[in-house]
Amino acid sequence: MDFSQKMLRDNALKDKVIIVTGGGSGLGKAMTTYFLELGAKVAITSRDIEKLQNTATELEKQTGGTCLPIACDVRHYDQVESMLQQVLSAFGKVDVLLNNAAGNFISPTERLSANAFDTIIDIVLKGSKNCTLALGKHWINKGEKNKTVLNIVTTYAWTGSGYVVPSATAKAGVLAMTRSLAVEWAKYGIRMNAIAPGPFPTKGAWDRLLPGEL
């Protein structure tokens, strides 16, 4: 079986505009690649504009699509609002928000500082909240329907897990927000979904598991 074959037809996402937070590398980059291959226009965000620009250039050459890099720290609502305005100026609309920006520490919890714990909560939970709220307010105020928010969570958002407590806490919050807004915003034509891909090899994951040379 050829697992490289697309599940969706060519141009399935033609004329769609998607925002991918944490889109410069890893899972975000992989999802952005697929969206571009399916015909979507994609805005990718993170704090590292150089990485974003390199990724956007690479993916546009690879797919022939349009990828817009925007520096944005999702922990700050004003930056999220600015990012949204830049996307609207470039593409005129947004159809999908993909909350993928994340962080994690693999560590006994008692060894973490309060600031380290807060950092993960702020990126994952507060960042997802900021982006969801900004896009939701925009769509609702404009009366735009058939919109989607897709949140990336983890399997331990349901089960909990030792040594990743800040991430587990934040992802459980994102899951609760997703379920709650799925009910509240359904009347506005906004779909809320969350997926938990499970573990897979990315540079970010390997750097945390193998932080030094063996």
Language-model features: where?
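A glycine/serine/threonine-rich, flexible loop-to-helix segment
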Residues: 55-57, 187, 199-214
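Active-site loop-to-helix junction immediately N-terminal to the catalytic Tyr of the SDR YXXXK motif
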Residues: 112, 160-168, 180, 205-208
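The beta1-alpha1 cofactor-binding region of Rossmann-like NAD(H)/NADP(H)-dependent oxidoreductases
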Residues: 49-50, 71-83, 114
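Substrate-binding pocket helix/loop in short-chain dehydrogenase/reductase
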Residues: 108-109, 113-121, 205-206, 214
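Active-site helix of classical SDR
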Residues: 132, 170, 178
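Conserved glycine-rich cofactor-binding loop
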Residues: 17, 22-26
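Alpha-helical segment proximal to the catalytic Tyr-Lys
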Residues: 137, 141, 183-187
